[in-house]
Amino acid sequence: MNPKNSEINEKSTGYLKDYAEEYEIFLNEYPDFMTTSAIDELRKSDYPNLDRQNHIYLDYTGAGLFSISQIRKHHELLASNIFGNPHSSNPTSLAMTKLVERTRKAVLDFFKADPEEYDCIFTCNASGSLKLVGESYPFTTNSHYLLTYDNHNSVNGIREFTRAKGAKINYISVLSPQLHLDQNELNCQLEQAIPGANNLFAFPAQSNFSGVQHSLDWVDIAKSKGWDVLLDVAAFVPTNKLDLSLVKPDYVCLSFYKMFGYPTGVGLLIAKKEALKKLHRPWFAGGTITVASVKGDKYYLHQGAEGFEDGTLNYLSLPAIEIGLNHINSVGYEVIHQRVMILTDWLLKKLSNIHHSNGSKLIQIYGPDTIESRGGTIAL
């Protein structure tokens, strides 16, 4: 912090105080902050560019930061091996196929998804995963597509596939000022599912806009009323652990770079095997088929994940996923979550205490004004 700037700001706003004094007050208010000190040591060893370039990085939703150790481990793997296209069967390709399958297992293990129950499908990003579900879901004129006001635009975009097939589209509103879902409205809408029809309910575990964390209990409630559930966890999993042995949506979408920064260009769809059988691809591509003929219209898709992975995977990047997952495990979700929520609580209180000279609040926060049922995103 520049002392001169601090002096100017303190005189003009009365808000910024001496850093050391404020930090001592902060630690007295949040003694548990010291239990996350491992992150400070990790910052020195694995994220040195932050200090070298005088950066403060607070994004736990749009893009995570990759660590130096992640890059080194991935580059060492590539530099010491020869990997070929996994769609072939030569020694280099078989070596890559083995790594791809190891990565799938690591992903399912990380999210505690039973491999007998779930498949792991790699895509280009979370939006690609959502599009895959939207274009393949068997909507009919008897179907409902139910979603919430605070979904990501890529979830909103599925309504275009829905509309083209004549299905009904309904939104669940959020209640101001906390922006939680209107539970009465949601319960009412969930009762509207036509038995035996294909009904899809999509909602975010954490709102990309407000940081609200919606109850994952809605997954089981919706399924008990005849809905398939699409859960967007892209904003949730960077700082919260998702356990698919406890919560069992049909489709789960995310991007890995939001979790640990690297690699970009790889997303994930985790789908129940039974739910995957329900999807019907509107086309086929290289890598997804076992047989296709130019003399007729017949073609046969691969079973399981391979039938949904168009073309050649970003295969050289895939081993970096297991490295990134191991990195998160080494830090610990508990530590990450604790650090983020302490900082979020502090910031919410500070923002709420800034007033105009007439006493009225300067800042309007959209979403929860406490850390109950919320993540680190603050909309104002």
Predicted stretch roles:
Residues 2-380:
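Pyridoxal 5′-phosphate
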